[in-house]
């Protein structure tokens, strides 16, 4: 267990002699703390997005309702998987994941959706914008994890970025119509 500059304890594979040093492939305590801060925001972002996607899933209207209703379900299932994986990664690193709507809203860069009647085009454009935001944020975390030698977090984030990239591309193609 490593002690970070913020006084929190974080687990890593580093030996106590390597704490604060940059052992090859082993993130130091400061890097782990920085990664955990970003992962906490990702959990919050995904928590807010999960609820937002449900709002769209329930309240969209338009000619292609059934297809978009099912697409939004695919998205929130995917978000759930990422949400859980990142929260569990935080726990593996010895940190705590935010676990309340109040925490999510305080940490998230994604705004709540309170509108109840949403056109399909509007909902998909908003989802695309949120996915683009997530892609930018996850890319920053992926770089930090890779540079720090945190291969596990790097791999998790790379998988999420692959999924987001495809969704952004497909939403862009859909919205061109």
Swiss-Prot record:
PROSITE patterns: DPS_1, DPS_2. InterPro entries: DPS_DNA-bd, DPS_DNA-bd_CS, Ferritin-like, Ferritin-like_SF, Ferritin_DPS_dom. This is Antigen TpF1. GO terms for molecular function: ferric iron binding; oxidoreductase activity, acting on metal ions. Keywords: Disulfide bond. It comes from the Bacteria. Transmembrane segments: none annotated. Homodecamer; either linked or stabilized by disulfide bonds. Belongs to the Dps family. May play an important structural role in the outer membrane.
